[in-house]
Amino acid sequence: NGVSRTPMPTDAGNFGLLDRRVAAEVARLLDRVPTSTPLELRDRALFELAYSSGLRAEELVSLDVASVDYDDEQVRVEGKGGKTRIVPIGEHALSALRAYAERARPALSPTRSGAATSGGGEPALFLSKSGRRLSTSDVRRRLRVWARHAAVQAGASPHWLRHSFATHLLEGGADLRAIQELLGHASLSTTQVYTQVESARLRTVYSRSHPRA
């Protein structure tokens, strides 16, 4: 996934400000993706899901239509090493996915230049304008487009959304073991990079709360 471009807090007093700023940038990026055309609906669903469920770019493009369980509000993800995990889908992402599935995906999969039809066999959830499965480079390119449109300052990438997902879960009270499972990390040690965030948060709480801090 590369190195995260979301800056880690270096000053405990700045942690709350940093977390709010990153959350605001993510929200602004997602909200600035229009929903007027099939490609816009696709992109909105793609990036809402990336942030809602913390998926890697490779995992996003490998999703099939059947991967999404709308009734149970979850997605089945084939992660690294062929390991499968079930991840919840948030309300905003689920709404965006429904809009994409109903209004956009059929329009992206007509028989055109050999592209598969929606009923003819292309199982991919996210389709290109030619009706084929998106590539990871497509995902990164489209995210850069919308990041510029939203004037997002941080280096926007799929991993930036994934890192923000984990950071905001930790800030909201989730424990590392739960985050490990949601991210699909094989080892807890991989997830422990987020202890830097937790340490900064605890230091902020301590500094604000202890009379002799």
Model feature map: region roles:
Residues 1-213:
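Conserved catalytic core of the tyrosine transesterase superfamily
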